[in-house]
Design a protein with these regions (language model features):
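Short helix-capping/hinge motifs at transmembrane helix termini and TM-loop junctions
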Residues: 44, 48-52, 110-111, 121-124
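Membrane-helix interface segments in multi-pass membrane proteins
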Residues: 37-83, 162
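Membrane-interface extramembranous regions at the lipid-water interface
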Residues: 1-32, 88-102, 118-162
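Alpha-helical transmembrane segments of multipass membrane proteins
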Residues: 36-41, 111, 115
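Residue-level signal for alpha-helical context at structural boundaries
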Residues: 25, 44-45, 57, 112, ...
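Selective recognition of hydrophobic, aromatic-rich stretches within alpha-helical transmembrane segments
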Residues: 1-5, 63-88, 97-122
Length: 162
């Protein structure tokens, strides 16, 4: 699964808390989310810094310029708009490892995010589980490049004359 496919899948299942999400879907979504958030944040800090440098009154605490405020507003809209998909893909990822979505609440206690991170790195439950069929397929991932090696034609015999 590519990063674009993962983002489209997560956004298409905006508030779908049932089913399972593969590791790749979860981590590609997390990477895309982090990149967009970081770019917006750096842009906001840069705009606030430029305005504070060019306008000394804007450097006073609480007197941020309009550009930085607009970008911080955009960050707020981004975080608000992606909260449900992020929550949903995390719960589906927990389902894929055979755990209830209620395990997400462990992130509310100190160091609970570490436990959630370990769960997110975990492998899928083989076959179907209580939350649905394995998104990798019944026997694991069977895409090109994975699985048992395939032999095409007859092996070449090196060193023997033909």
């Amino acid at each position: 699964m590519s990063i674009g496919t993962a983002v489209r899948t997560v956004l298409a299942q905006y508030a779908t808390f049932s089913g399972r999400a593969r590791r790749s879907e979860y981590w590609w979504w997390s990477l895309a989310y982090s990149i967009v958030f970081a770019v917006l944040y750096v842009l906001a800090i840069a705009l606030v810094g430029v305005e504070a440098f060019t306008n000394p009154e804007a450097a006073a605490p609480g007197a941020g310029g309009i550009g930085g405020l607009l970008v911080f507003g955009l960050i707020f809209v981004f975080v608000l708009g992606t909260f449900l998909p992020s929550l949903a893909v995390t719960i589906r990822r927990l389902h894929d490892t055979g755990r209830s979505g209620w395990w997400y609440l462990i992130s509310l206690v100190p160091f609970g995010n570490i436990v959630l991170l370990v769960f997110a790195f975990g492998d899928s439950t083989p076959g179907s589980n209580a939350y649905g069929p394995n998104p990798k397929g019944e026997g694991g991932y069977s895409g090109q490049g994975y699985g048992a090696p395939q032999q095409y034609g007859t092996p070449q015999q090196y060193g023997t004359p033909q």
